Amino acid sequence: MKTKNLLKLATLSVITLFLGVIQSCSPEQAESGGQLYDLGTGMESRSISFENPTGEPGQGGQAESNLGVGRKGFPAKGIAPGETVVLCDIAGAGTIRHIWMTGGFKDRTEALRSMVVRAYWENQEHPSVECPLGDFMGSAHAKANSYQSAVHSVGERASLNIWLPMPFNEHAKMTLTNDGDENITLFYQIDYTIGDRHPEKLGRLHVCFVRENPTTLTTDFEILPKRIGEGRFIGTVLGVRTLEGNWWGEGEVKIFMDGDTEFPTICGTGSEDYVCVSYGMQQTPFFYHGCSWNKDGFISMYRWHLPDPIYWKKECRITIQQIGWSREYVEETGSALYERKDDWSSATFWYEPLPSAKLPEFPDLESRVANLWEEPEE
C-alpha cells in the first residue's frame, strides 16, 4: 500500500511538473513564434548582416576574401565619425527576434554612448527607438560588463545581444550612427521572421534614453516621460553615478497611469527594491531584475516586467525619487532620509501602437558621454 501511494505521488509530481513547464513556456513562446514544435505558423526565417544586407534567400556570403568568394569576405565594416549605417530595411510583415553586435567597443570608453541606435516602424518619419547602443543593449555608463537577463546577454569582450520581439506590419528600418570622433569596427546580425500573423492591436517597440546630470533636488527623475494612448511598459536599464557618499537608493518608483494626478497607482518602496534586491545594491544579475555593474559609485541595474506586465489604457508616466539615507541627518531632522542629487540615466522599453508621438528630445553627444568613469567625491 505504501509503495502504491509513493508511486501515485511520484506520477502526480511528474505530471504536475510537465504541465507546469508547458504553462510557463506558453506565453513567451507565443511571442517568439509559437510552440517549439509548431511547424504551421506560416513564418519564414531570415537574417541580415554585412554578408547579406537585404536578408534575401540565397544572397548571403557572396563577398570575396583572400581565400576566395564566399570565404568570410565581408563580416565587418568600419563606421567613420558622423556616418550612419542602415542595419536593416525590411518590407512586409515580420518580427525582429534577436540582434547581436560586437566590434571596437570594449577598449573605447565612450563608444557605447556615442553610437546611437534608431528604429522606424511602418515608415513613420520619426524614430520609435532612439538610444545609445550600450544602453539599448543592456548596459549603462558605456560599460559592457558580462551578464545575462531575460532581455539581454553581454559577453566578456563586449558581445551584445537583445532578444525582445520587435514586430511590424509593413516596414522596419534600423540605423546605427557614430557620433564619436573615432572609426568603430562593427560586426552584427539581425535575426527575424517574415509572414508573421500579428494581432489586430499591435504594439511596436519604443525605446527612449534620458539622462539628468545632475538631477534636480526634490524633482523626481523621469524613467518614462508621459505617453498618451495605450501601451505596455516592458522595463528599463537604469544608470546611477553617485555624486556624494552615503546610501543613495531610498527613492521610490512611481507609475502614474490613466488619470493619476498627485499620487500614482503603482508605488514602490525603494530604488534597490524596484530591481528586486534589498538592503543596499549588490552586483547580482538575475533573469528579470538585478544589477550588472556596481563599482566606484557607478551602478547599472535593470527591471523587466515580463511575467508581471504593466499595461495602461490612456496615459502613463514613470518616475523615481532621489532620496538618500544617513544617520548624520537624524539629529537635525529626526530621520535618516534626505533629498539628494545624483547623475541618473535610463533606457526605457515599452510597446505602443502607431502612429505614436515623438520621443523626448535626445541628449547631444557631450551630455551623453560627460563624466564617464569619474569617481564620486567623498
Report each predicted region and the residues it spans.
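Beta-strand-centric surfaces of beta-sandwich/beta-rich domains
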Residues: 28-378
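Bacterial N-terminal signal peptides
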Residues: 10-21
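Bacterial N-terminal signal peptides that target proteins for export
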Residues: 2-11
